[in-house]
A protein has these predicted regions:
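A glycine-rich helix->loop->beta "capping" turn
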Residues: 72-85
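Flexible N-terminal pre-Rossmann segment of NAD(P)-dependent oxidoreductases
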Residues: 1-8
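The beta1-alpha1 cofactor-binding region of Rossmann-like NAD(H)/NADP(H)-dependent oxidoreductases
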Residues: 57-69
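Aromatic pocket-lining residues of Rossmann-like dinucleotide-binding sites
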Residues: 27
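Conserved NAD(P)H cofactor-binding loop of Rossmann-fold oxidoreductase domains
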Residues: 87-89
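N-terminal Rossmann-fold NAD(P) dinucleotide-binding loop
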Residues: 20-21
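Conserved glycine-rich cofactor-binding loop
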Residues: 9, 16-17
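Conserved glycine-rich Rossmann-like NAD(P)H-binding loop of the short-chain dehydrogenase/reductase
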Residues: 30-46
């Protein structure tokens, strides 16, 4: 089922593989802007297909770097509506 959540945004940790990648895909398909945080890039093919996904390479144990990326995303989208933590899952 495809819904329209245009204007909503999500931050996903561990977003480049397994469950995180699938969640990123589903949220993107429902018009949610997604900040994908991971050490591994999901690849240009994925990012070109899911245009409202934005990838940032970050180690989630580095709080300063994590905060920097999340604050920039929040400023751009005015809010963060969803947080999905899949790092290490």
């Amino acid at each position: 089922m495809k819904l329209n959540y245009k204007g909503k945004s999500a931050v996903i940790t561990g977003a480049s593989g397994g469950m995180g990648l699938e969640i990123s895909k589903k949220l993107s398909q429902n018009n949610i802007s997604v900040l994908m945080l991971d050490l591994k890039n999901p690849g240009n093919e994925f990012l070109n297909k899911y245009k409202n996904c934005e990838f940032k390479k970050v180690n989630v144990t580095n709080f300063k770097s994590l905060k920097l990326h999340i604050e920039a995303f929040n400023k751009k989208h005015k809010s963060i509506d969803y947080l999905v933590n899949t790092t290490g899952v």
